[in-house]
Amino acid sequence: MGVTNFFGEAWRTGKSIVTGLGITFREMMFRPAITVFYPEQRDDVPPWFRGIPVLKTDLRTGEYKCTSCMQCAQACPVNVITIEWHQDPETKKKVCDRFAIDMSRCMLCNFCVEACPFDSLVMGYDYELCKVNPENLVFEFEDLLRLGLKYSKAEEPGPKATRSSTPPWVFHGLTNATEDDIQDIHGYLGRPPLPKGYEPELKPQFRKPAEEAAEAQQAEAAGQPAAEPGKTNGEEAGQP
C-alpha cells in the first residue's frame, strides 16, 4: 500500500511539473512580451493621464499666458500653488514674479487647470518626479515654463470680448433667454440640442418678474404705458 501511494504521488508531482513547464514555454514562445525594460523602454501614457501641472507659452509672441489672476491658487484644495506678482506702473497689468508648485503635496486633482480662465495651465505627462531631496519637488516659474513648452502653441490673436464671443449666460438671464440662447448654451457646454419649442421652467422666485416683463412687452407693443412692478394695468387704472 505504501509503494502504491509513493508511485501515485510521484506521478501527480511529475504531471504538475510538466503542466507548469508547458504553460511557461507557451507563454514564452507564443505570447507577446508585456515586460517593459524601464528606463530603456517607456510606455506611452494615456491622454487622460495627470502629471505635473505646467505653464503654457504663446509661441507666437514668446510670452507666458499666465496673468496672475490667482484663480488656480484659490481653487487648489491643498494650497500647493504660490503666486507672487507686482503691477506694471505703465500698463497697469499684473506681472508674475513667482509661480511655484509643491509637488510633494500636490494631489493631481486638475482643479487648477479647470479654474484657469486663460488656458495657461495643463496637466503634463511627466511622471518621473522622484527626488533625493524633498526641496527639489518645489517647481519654480522657470521650471514650469520649460516643462510646458511641449504643450504650447502659437495663439492666433482673437477679437476682444463681445456679445457674440462671450458665453451666452453672461448676457442672458432666465427671464429673457430665448430658445436660440438656450440652444447656444447647450452647444457651448457640449450637450445635445434641446427639442424644438422647449421653454425653460422658471423657479418660483423668477416667475413673477418674468410675467411682469412679458406684460410690459405686450403693453409696449400695444402702445399702452407699462404697469408699475407688482401691479397689472387693470389695477393701475383703478379697476377691480
Swiss-Prot record:
Renumbered to this chain, the Basic and acidic residues biased-composition regions fall at 198-211
Instruction: Kindly give the PROSITE patterns that the UniProt entry links to this protein.
Output: 4FE4S_FER_1 (PS00198), 4FE4S_FER_2 (PS51379)
Instruction: Report any Pfam family annotated for this entry.
Output: Fer4_7
Per its UniProt record, the required cofactor names are: [4Fe-4S] cluster
Q: Name one GO cellular component term.
A: plasma membrane
Query: What are its E.C. numbers?
Result: 7.1.1.-
Which reactions are catalysed by this chain? Answer: a quinone + NADH + 5 H(+)(in) = a quinol + NAD(+) + 4 H(+)(out)
| Enzyme class at the top of the EC tree | translocase
The membrane-spanning stretches of this chain are none
Q: Which UniProt keywords apply?
A: 4Fe-4S, Cell membrane, Iron, Iron-sulfur, Membrane, Metal-binding, NAD, Quinone, Repeat, Translocase, Ubiquinone
What function does this protein fulfil? NDH-1 shuttles electrons from NADH, via FMN and iron-sulfur (Fe-S) centers, to quinones in the respiratory chain. The immediate electron acceptor for the enzyme in this species is believed to be ubiquinone. Couples the redox reaction to proton translocation (for every two electrons transferred, four hydrogen ions are translocated across the cytoplasmic membrane), and thus conserves the redox energy in a proton gradient.
How does this chain assemble? Answer: NDH-1 is composed of 14 different subunits. Subunits NuoA, H, J, K, L, M, N constitute the membrane sector of the complex.
Recorded hits in PANTHER family, A to Z, give: NADH DEHYDROGENASE UBIQUINONE IRON-SULFUR PROTEIN 8, MITOCHONDRIAL, NADH-QUINONE OXIDOREDUCTASE SUBUNIT I 2
Give the protein's recorded name: NADH-quinone oxidoreductase subunit I 2
Q: Which organism is it from?
A: Symbiobacterium thermophilum (strain DSM 24528 / JCM 14929 / IAM 14863 / T)
Read off the lineage from the record. Bacteria, Bacillati, Bacillota, Clostridia, Eubacteriales
Name of the gene encoding the protein in the UniProt record: nuoI2
